[in-house]
Structure formats: structure tokens, C-alpha cells
Amino acid sequence: MHASCCCAPPESVSHTRRISYKYSGTSYPTRTTTTSSSAPEFTNKKQSTAMAPTTAAAAASSNGGGESDGSSKEWRLTAPTRGGAMAAAGDKMSIRAVRYKISASVDDRGPRPVLPLAHGDPSVFPEFRTAAEAEDAVADALRSGDFNCYPAGVGLPAARRAVADHLSRDLPYKLSSDDIFLTAGGTQAIEVVISILAQPGTNILLPRPGYPNYEARAAFNNLEVRHFDLIPEKGWEIDLNSLESIADKNTTAIVIINPNNPCGNVYTYEHLSKVAEVARKLGILVITDEVYGNLVFGSSPFVPMGCFGHIVPILTIGSLSKRWIVPGWRLGWVAICDPKKTLQETKIATLITNFLNVSTDPATFIQGALPNILKNTKEEFFKRIIDLLTETSDICYRGIKDIKCITCPHKPEGSMFVMVKLNLYLLEGIHDDVDFCCQLAKEESVILCPGSVLGMKNWVRITFAIDSSSLLDGLERIKSFCQRHKKKNPLNYI
């Protein structure tokens, strides 16, 4: 029913490499990292044999005495028994790795299609197809023959200018093309921002629950993470009172995600204003993740954090992926929203430029198409997507309320997700959120995202960015699963 390329687990690959960075006179220590695409083990862990470095003796033994074919050489490229920082981060803090692991629990011989309710990629569903204007812009850029070259590290000038104009429409000041840096999706934008801010001894404030890529990148860069809570009883508002208590002189930034992934809430102008004032008082910049910007369908309109750039300097992360439903196009950006030029002395633009000069680029033809994508996409397309998400979010919220073992504290008003609490005391034989998701996948072929990877143990994240019939089917399967696993003692029910 659905494209399989998003769900198939990759081959497990590990390799060791040395990386060092130097930006504007600031040296970052060389470190050894190990990257791995293998998914983490959650339940029914089997004892694994540690892989030791290849020695001459081992090579000789495996080669019948060690012929002179190089196998007797002691190679220093090893498969470590314990992964490096990035491998560890990817193992514990990657939605993709967790999704692969849970997908492996699905019975491939089952008669029903797998329902992907774990991640926000509705592009496989026909009703969520991107705008014709966006497709035409890409086709025209390709056919022109003008965009087959390497782009500048920071992006094509015309594309940067188009993003600046696009964002400026909702801000009380104008951005210039020099304020915009194009990235290979929002994921690379996170990598850039976290990497340039990481200094020995510094820390960053991240939301809990939150998007795990921030924690993974912080771990990779030896940047200490300090969490502030989002309060479910208050519509997932930020616990502002806790910010000053967890920050100190070494705090470098705070991350805000709005509209929120994973919670589905949208922050009001007043709440964002308070966040800006707290950040100003602490002397830290705000990183605002607006990848789901304008995907709102509740009572609160989307307010760009950049509106408060006169209070506190802001780095905005955005992309085409979600609003245009094209995550595979890998086009994102970092925007410096700093009308008072507070960050000028920090040379943050130079740091970003230097990083991107030694990093990968978004595809040139997508950059070439970007001005026409932003300019020509009709409002009717955006309205259609909002109408779809409004309908499916309502279906999701109503369906969750009808399932006794799960609780939704706040109806989603934006993004593509909702966080749901598991009432495990009502269930038999379910140990935690990961166990719930694995057993659900095995028995019902429904894939959910466990809250543990998002910082909320015994919660799950559900996406409603899916066709309505599949969503209804998925909710019915979750309900059936809970009914089968409910505790027999009726006194346990409320």
C-alpha cells in the first residue's frame, strides 16, 4: 500500500573516523567518532559477541595460516565494542533507528497493510501530493540546464534572496540574503547550529518532550543538555519558571519548536514574548525550529519567533519539507533574525559559512527551483493541506478519547503529531512505551513512535498526517490491541 523505502532497515555498518573543526580561530578538539546505522535493541535482547580488533593471529587463523594476501596485517580500522558519540546518539536518540526496530516486529505475512503512524511524511498519500507549481518549478530548473553545477556552500544567491523575502513577509523588519543559509533539509540546519555553538564547558536548554536530533547533535559535539519541561496540563506550554533555575553563565542558547513536534501545540504571541524576555535576561540566543511553520488549524495563529528579534537574537530553522510535503527534496535553511546586529561581534554568519563550506549542499536544481516554488505556490494548496490536517486531527483526537488505555491531554492545533499518555496500569503484559509499540506492531501492523526517544517515557507520539481511512483503521487496531491486553480485574478501570 505504501512506499517501502521509508521503512526498510538498512544494513548495519560501523566505521571509525577522526574529525576536528576550527572556526574563526576557535579550535575544537579532535575526537574519534563511530557512526552506525544499526537500530537499537529494546526487548528480548540476545547476547552478542563483542567484536575485537583484528589481530595478526586472528587473521592467520581465519585464513588457514595467513597467506601473503594482506590478511596477516594488523589493521587499526576496527569495529569497536562500544560506539563513539554519534553512534551512541543515533542508537538512543534517533526516531529513524527506533522506527526500524519497531518495524522489524511486524509480521510480514500478515494480511493487513502496515499503517505508518510514527513519522511525519504524508507524501506517499495522493491527497497530500505537493503543489503542481512546486513540481513545475523543479522540472523547469532541471530542463534549463542551468543548475547542474556545484552551488556556493551557503546556497545560490537567488534562492537565499527568495527565502529572505518569503520570511520577511511575516516579520516587522526585512531580512537580507546574507541572513539566509541554505541547508540539506532541517536536519542539516540543526547540525550546523548546534555545531557552531558547541564550546568546551557550554550547555544548551532543550524542551522535554522534544525532537531527538537536537540531543543527538549535542552529544556528538560534547555540548551539555539541560531540559526544561513542556506542561501537558497547560497545552504543552514551556515551564518558564524553570528556565532561570537550570541556566547558568555557560548556557549558550534555548531551543523552541513551534508549531511543536511532538506535541502538536502552537505557542501564542504572549507566550513567545515571555520566552524572548527570559532569554534576554539570561543573555542567550533563541534557536527556533519552525519546520512546521504555518501548519496550524486551531485557535492560535502561527507567530514566527523572529517577531521578537528586537528583544533577543534568534536563529530560525525552516524547510520546504513539511509545508510543501516534500521531505525528500532536502531543502532547509537557517535564518539570522537579529535586526539589532547583536550577533555581529560573534561572527556567527562566518561560523555558519565556514561549516557549510566543508559540508554537503542541498541539490542545486532544488535551489534553482526555490524562488518559483515560494513565489508561485497558490494559497489553495496550503488551504487544502490545512483542511486535510484539520479533518485528520479531529479524527485522531476523537478516536483516542474512545480508547481507555490512552489519554490525550491536549487536542493538537498544529504540526502533524499528538502526544498520548499510556495508562499502563490498565494493561496486562506491557512493560513500557517501547514494549507497547513493539507488541502493537507485531499484532496489529501499526507503527507508533515511543515517547522514550522524545524524552517522555510511557507516552507515544501519533501522526495524523495520513489519509483518513487509514487513520480510522489504525485507531481501531490500537483499540482492539488495548482491549486484548486489558487487565481482567475490573477494579483497575476508571
UniProtKB/Swiss-Prot annotation:
Catalytic activity: nicotianamine + 2-oxoglutarate = 3''-deamino-3''-oxonicotianamine + L-glutamate
GO biological process, one term: tyrosine catabolic process
Gene for this chain: NAAT1
NCBIfam families, A to Z: tyr_nico_aTase (TIGR01265)
Post-translational modification N6-(pyridoxal phosphate)lysine, affected residues: 322
Protein family (similarity comment): Belongs to the class-I pyridoxal-phosphate-dependent aminotransferase family.
Segments for region (Disordered): 24-76
E.C. code: 2.6.1.80
SUPFAM superfamilies per UniProt: PLP-dependent transferases (SSF53383)
Function: Involved in biosynthesis of mugineic acid family phytosiderophores, which are ferric iron chelators produced in graminaceous plants in response to iron deficiency.
Keyword set includes Phosphoprotein: no
Required co-factors: pyridoxal 5'-phosphate
Tissue: Expressed in companion and pericycle cells adjacent to the protoxylem of roots. Expressed in companion cells of shoots.
Induction pattern: Induced by iron deficiency in roots and leaves.
Enzyme class: transferase
Protein name as annotated: Nicotianamine aminotransferase 1
Compositionally biased intervals (Low complexity): 24-38, 48-62
